[in-house]
Swiss-Prot record:
Disulfide bonds: none
Species lineage: Eukaryota, Viridiplantae, Streptophyta, Embryophyta, Tracheophyta
Subcellular location as annotated: Plastid, Chloroplast
Source species: Arabidopsis thaliana (Mouse-ear cress)
Compositionally biased region (Acidic residues): 81-97
Name of the protein: Pentatricopeptide repeat-containing protein At5g50280, chloroplastic
Transit peptide: 1-44
Superkingdom classification of source: Eukaryota
GO cellular component annotations of the record: chloroplast
Compositional bias per record (Polar residues), positions renumbered to this chain: 713-723
Keywords, alphabetical: Chloroplast, Plastid, Repeat, Transit peptide
InterPro entries, per the entry: Pentatricopeptide_rpt, TPR-like_helical_dom_sf
PPR repeats mapped onto the chain: 272-306, 307-342, 343-377, 378-412, 413-447, 448-483, 484-518, 519-553, 554-588, 589-623, 624-658
Length: 723
């Protein structure tokens, strides 16, 4: 039996579900206020609308009765306590409105929800705190370590709900697996199952699907499912479909998921939310985000109600599709209005969405309200928050979140330590990173490649410590860890900063020999090494290699190239790099022109500087203090004080004044030149006035002594007059 003749012939998924509605979200700008920061918190990267009459993007805060499926508590005592809390909250929040807090406070707890825990204040994140800390030797509650990301935990939860990991004990399933392993080239599994009609049950079919999927025989799973559907009675079950959707999603076979979904039996048992959760998860894993959204919309049309797993998967899907945190929040509100219960995975996805956009304060609000509703944060949520603050270079907040997590009895994972080590590597504190690595091992956590990469980076960022970075690299290889592209990039950068461009290039060649593909960051580090050494030949060679390998450079890459060529007087090559900027869709920045000006000034090409300033104006680039300072020093160097004073005046008018120390030095030079210029001008003016009024003394010419050559005091050459 071939696939062409099977019932899995290509059909349109949309023939069964007329889905035409797409994601449409309102555009208005969203402002939040955080209880931790008394200032407006933006949920959008765009500027706020000037119109004050724009509609609110938030839905109603559910002042009306909840849906029928959710029972409201009838205890009058609880209601009175809630009303008192609401009155206190209203008194505290009269001066501002926080839509997130208002949403959470408006939600009525269901009878199945746990009571709110005691109010816990956030850890105090003080400024100017010490950067050193000590980890407690043990924890209150040794929980199971969770290393996965939020979306991975949702995927695992969905699989456990579907029963994918439930152990089986069946010899029939193993026989089917052996048949799948021993299929010949033109055979299908369905052709080999002629003797299994009365031997296998629907539970054993699910077991066979799981075993074949784990062994990589996904196509055989499709033929086996077709065979199951053709049996009388049919062996196809919602559980089998769920397992198959999960396996197809792993292999990114989204078309088969849609095909199977459109041909589901018209039975009530197949209208199972777990089945549709698996389909949405599989489509999301295949990066078919629009199709995943349409499946979710189809659920409502066939009266399949979403649950908390649906909500968690959908939040992760929207985030991966590039939707903003504002849009994700709207979906969460709508699903909450439908009576979907909240879970740890739902809030973990929300926190991740907000952190990815840099909305850390809003993510903290969500995390705090989550715990007040009885949903405890896990290690993954804290790792997400710590990583967001680390990327913003707020190491004190990272420390505070780590201490708060530890105080709550949560066990740090290897990912937690990697975030901490990366934070201290940014601060160029390798000693603390070494301490973290030892404490990590003492707690039984095995350092991974990222852990050692943070250590290499910490040494590499510190000048003259490339030998320690190389030692950390060798330690990583000694424990059996294979270096990654990031590891080699950190090592190359360490050599580059220390001036060892030969070692940097040797590491680059070793990386290529080991079959590790260099990233754009790796190429940029190698280019930086030769830029520092002034080797324009190697600079050009690496650049051409990048173009051959079709590696798209970043703005940092092009700025490195430009600076390397321009400082060596290769202005034509530097201009070619600027041209490549435009081809890649990258407009030159102020830093780009600052580098060009510095190179032209050092090369004695000060006449080119006003032209570069005009080019900046044509590109709507506003010169900064570095631009003006470069031009002023260039003209002072060639004693063109008139232009130096002119651009100093422009700098002051534009408000682009450098830092106090640099400006004090610049002012001292200009004032000294001004005094010298004033003295010369004063002497010249006095000379002109005296000449006009005839006050200039005439020079008297003395009478020439005709015997001057016979004066005794005149020096004569030795030996000229000899007796």
């Amino acid at each position: 039996m071939s696939m062409a003749s099977s019932s899995l012939a290509t059909q349109s998924f949309f023939s069964s579900f007329p889905l035409s509605h797409r994601l449409h979200f309102p555009v208005p700008y969203l402002l939040l206020r955080s209880s931790f920061f008394r200032k407006p918190l933006s949920l959008s990267a765009t500027s706020p609308s000037s119109s004050s009459s724009s509609p609110s993007i938030f839905l109603s805060c559910f002042d009306d009765a909840l849906p029928d499926k959710i029972q409201q508590p009838e205890n009058s005592t609880i209601n009175s306590e809630e009303s008192e809390c609401e009155e206190e909250d209203d008194e505290e929040g009269d001066d501002f409105t926080d839509p997130i807090l208002k949403f959470f406070k408006s939600r009525t707890l269901t009878s199945e929800s746990t009571a709110d825990p005691a109010r816990e204040s956030k850890f105090s994140l003080q400024k100017n705190r010490r950067t050193s800390w000590h980890l407690a030797p043990d924890f209150a509650d040794p929980e199971t370590e969770i290393e996965s990301k939020p979306e991975e935990s949702v995927f695992v939860t969905n699989q456990q709900t579907l029963g994918v990991h439930i152990p089986f004990e069946s010899g029939v399933a193993r026989e089917i697996l052996e048949l799948a392993k021993n299929l010949k080239e033109n055979q299908t599994l369905g052709e080999m199952l002629s003797g299994f009609e009365r031997r296998v049950s629907d539970t054993e079919c699910v077991e066979a699907l799981v075993m074949m999927g784990e062994s990589g025989f996904v196509k055989s799973c499709l033929y086996f499912y077709e065979w199951m559907s053709l049996q009388e009675p049919s062996l196809a079950s919602p559980r089998a479909c769920s397992v198959l959707f999960t396996l197809l999603g792993r292999e990114r076979m989204a078309d088969y998921i849609l095909l199977l979904l459109s041909n589901l039996p018209d039975k009530e048992e197949f209208r199972d939310v777990r089945l549709y959760n698996a389909a949405i998860s599989g489509l999301s894993a295949s990066q078919r985000y629009d199709d995943a959204w349409e499946v979710y919309e189809a659920m409502d049309k066939i009266n399949v109600y979403p649950d908390n797993v649906t909500c968690a998967i959908l939040i992760t899907t929207l985030r991966k599709a590039g939707r903003s945190a504002k849009e994700v929040w709207e979906i969460f509100e709508k699903m909450s209005e439908k009576g979907v219960k909240w879970s740890q995975d739902v809030f973990g996805g929300l926190v991740k969405s907000f952190c990815d956009e840099g909305l850390k304060e809003e993510a903290l609000v969500i995390q705090t309200e989550m715990e007040k509703k009885g949903i405890r944060s896990n290690t993954i949520v804290y790792n997400t928050l710590m990583d967001a603050y680390n990327k913003s270079n707020h190491i004190e907040e990272v420390e505070g979140l780590f201490t708060e997590m530890r105080d709550k009895g949560l066990k740090p994972s290897a990912a937690t330590y990697n975030i901490l080590m990366d934070a201290y590597a940014r601060r160029m504190q390798p000693d603390i990173v070494e301490t973290l690595l030892r404490e990590m091992e003492d707690l039984g956590l095995e350092p991974n490649v990222k852990s050692y990469t943070c250590l290499i980076s910490a040494y590499g960022r510190t000048k003259k410590m490339s030998d320690m970075a190389a030692d950390a690299f060798l330690r990583m290889k000694k424990v059996g860890l294979k270096p990654s592209s990031h590891s080699y990039t950190a090592l190359i950068h360490a050599y580059s900063v220390s001036g060892w461009h030969e070692k940097a290039y040797a590491s680059f060649e070793e990386m290529c020999k080991e079959g590790i593909k260099p990233s754009v960051e790796t190429y940029t580090s190698v280019l930086d090494a030769f830029r520092r050494s002034g080797d324009t030949g190697k600079l050009m060679e690496i650049w051409k290699l990048m173009l051959r390998e079709k590696i798209k450079g970043t703005r940092i890459t092009y700025n490195t190239l430009l600076d390397g060529f321009a400082k060596q007087g290769l202005y034509i090559e530097a201009r070619d790099v600027v041209s490549e900027f435009s081809k890649m869709g990258l407009q030159p920045s102020v830093m780009t022109y600052n580098m060009l000006m510095n190179a032209y000034a050092r090369g004695g090409q000060d006449a080119k500087l006003p032209q570069l300033l005009k080019e900046m104006a044509a590109l709507n680039l506003k010169p900064d203090s570095i631009t003006y300072s470069t031009m002023i020093y260039a003209f002072v160097r060639v004693r063109d004080f008139k232009r130096a004073f002119f651009y100093h005046k422009m700098m002051v008018k534009s408000g682009q004044v450098p830092d106090p120390r640099s400006y004090e030095k610049l002012r001292a030079i200009l004032e000294d030149k001004a005094k010298t210029k004033n003295r010369k001008d004063k002497t010249a003016i006095l000379g002109i006035i005296n000449s006009k009024f005839g006050r200039v003394k005439a020079k008297t010419k003395g009478k020439k002594d005709e015997f001057w050559k016979y004066k005794t005091n005149r020096t004569t050459s030795p030996g000229r007059h000899r007796s």
